[in-house]
Amino acid sequence: MAAIDHGADAVYIGASRFGARAAVGNSVDDIRKLCDYAHCFGAKVYVTVNTIVYNDELETTRQLLLDLSDAGADAILVQDMAVLEMMDGLPMAAHASTQTDNRSAEKVRWLRDVGFSRVVLARELSLDEIREIHSQVPDVELEVFVHGALCVSYSGICYASQYCFGRSANRGECAQFCRMKFSLQDSNGREVLHDRYLLSLKDMNRVDHLEDLVEAGASSFKIEGRLKDLSYVKNVTAAYSQRLNALIRRHPDLYCRSSQGVCSYNFTPDLNRTFNRGYTTYFLHGRMPDIASMDTPKAMGAFVGMVKEIRHDSFNVAGVASFANGDGLCFLDEARQLIGFRANKVVGNRIYPYRMPHGLKPGTRLYRNNDQEFDRLMSKPSAERRIPICMTLRDVADGFELSASIHDKKYTLHYPAALQQAQKPPHDNIIRQLTKLGDTIYVCEAVDIPAGFNYFIPNSLLSDMRRQLVEKLVSQREEPLQLDVAKPSACAPYAYPYLNNIANQMARDFYGAKELSAYELKGGDGPIMQCRHCIRYALGYCVKHGGQRPVWQEPLSLILGDGRRFTLEFDCKNCQMNVYAS
C-alpha cells in the first residue's frame, strides 16, 4: 500500500505460492485488501504466479487463480504456459513475465498471439531493440525495468542455482549464485583474478531516461522492489512518480497517468539515499563499461567524502555531506574488501566509530550505506495521496442533486427534500460542509452552485449528502476484463529443449510437445547461464569493442570457493557470454 500512497499506478505482489520469491508470500485476504485500496485510485494489482509448476501442483494453482480472481486481481504475471491455460475465462489479464525470456520481436509476437496483453521485456535490451520490437508488434503493451537489482543471466534461463544447490530460480528459490566470489583461471591453470564478484552487477537506475523509453514504445515502467524495505519502496516510487509527472507536464497531449490521485510528500526523494550497489543504465544505450560491482555484492551507498585526518578514536571527512549518529559507513581496503562500521558519535565532519576500522587511511573514499536521518524520516508517515474532485449542487423539483466529477467521469446522487428558502446566503456554509472530506482519499477543489441558488439545507443533510457521495465514489469499480486465450501451434524455439521450462503435462500439451522437459526435471548439457554481461569486455580484453588482445589462454573458467569449475564461452557473434558447468 505504501507504493500506492507514494505514486504507483500498479503494484506487483506475490501470492502464498508460485511467486518468484518463494520465501515471501501474501494471503489471498491480504491481496483482496490491497486490491480494494488500489482500485480506489484506479491503480492495478498484478499478482506474480510466475514460477514453473509441477504436475502435482496444477489443481492447487487452478484454485489459487480462482481465488485471486475473486479477490479482484487485475492481472497475473505468468511464466508457465499451464497457468495461461488455466486463466482461460477468468477476468484477469495475462502478463508475460520476463522469466519467459523476452528479447526478440518474434518471441513477443508469439506471446501476443497466445493471449498475453503485456510483455515484460528482458532487462538487457537497448533502446534500439525496444523500439524495434514495438515497431514490429505495436499492439502489445511493453513493460520495461527501470530500477533495482539486476540478474546477470537472461531471466528464466538461469539454471546455476538449480545445478549448484538444488534451488531453482524458476521456482522462486534463487540462491544468488551471481553474488558469490569466483576466481578466474585460464586453460593453463593461470589465475587471472582471485576471489572477485565477477558476476555481480550494479543496480539499474534509469530515472533520467524515462522519456527515451516512452518514445521507444514502453508503456509501463517496472521497479524491482522484492525483498526491499519500506524506505526503499517509498523513496524509489516517489522519485519515479515525480519524474513521470514532469514528463507528462511537458507532453500533456501525448501522455497521461493510468491511475488517479495527487501525491504530496513530506520528504525529497533521493535515490542515492536508498539501498544500491552503485547504479548503471545497463545496456540501454548499448554495451557500456563498468556495469559490474566486482568488489562487493553488498550496498555501498552514496559517496560522502574522503577521509582526511585520523586519530586514535576518530577521523574527519573532507566533503559537504552531513552525518548523523548511527550512520552506516563503509570503504574498500587495499585488498578491495568491503569494510563497514557504525558512527557512534558525530561532531561536524568528525566521526567517532564504535570501533576504529582496520585499514582506514587518509585519502580513503568513504560511502554511506545506511542513512540514519533518512531512515527516521521514512519510518514516519511520508506521503498522502488524494483524488481531486469537483462538486456540483443543483436543486430539482423534489430536492437536490449532488455530483462529483473526477476527470471525465461524473457521479450523481439524488436527495429528496423539501425546498426551503434560506434566510441568509447559504453558499459559504454549503461549501464549508461539503468540502469536509477529512481522512477520505478525496480533496474537493471546487463546489459549483448556481448563482440563484437560495435554499436552506440543514448541516445534517449536507453531511449525509457528502458521506453518501463519497461512498458512491469509493464503491466504483472498473468492469472486469474478459480474456481470450488463443491456442498456439507447436513451438520449441530453443537449441536446448529445457530452455522452454516445461514442467507439467498441461504445458507440454500447450506446446504440442512430447519430449521437452524443464532443466529442473531432467537437467541438460547446455549453458546454465546466458549473459549479455561479458567478463572479457569488463576487463578490457574485447577486441570486437576496441580492447586489447587477451593475455590468457582460453577457455576461461570461474572457480567457486568450494572448487567447482564453470567454463566461459564467449559468443562474440551474438555478443553473449555463456556459462557451462564443467
Describe the role of every protein-language-model region.
Residues 1-5, 10-20, 30, 34-35, ...:
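Surface-exposed amphipathic alpha-helical tracts and adjacent flexible/coil segments at the periphery
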Residues 23-27:
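An active-site metal/cofactor-coordinating segment within enzyme catalytic domains
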Residues 51, 79-83, 100-102:
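Short glycine-enriched loops at secondary-structure junctions
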Residues 84-89:
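Short active-site loop/helix that positions an aromatic residue
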Residues 103-107:
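Short, glycine/polar-rich helix-capping loops at beta-to-alpha or helix-loop-helix junctions
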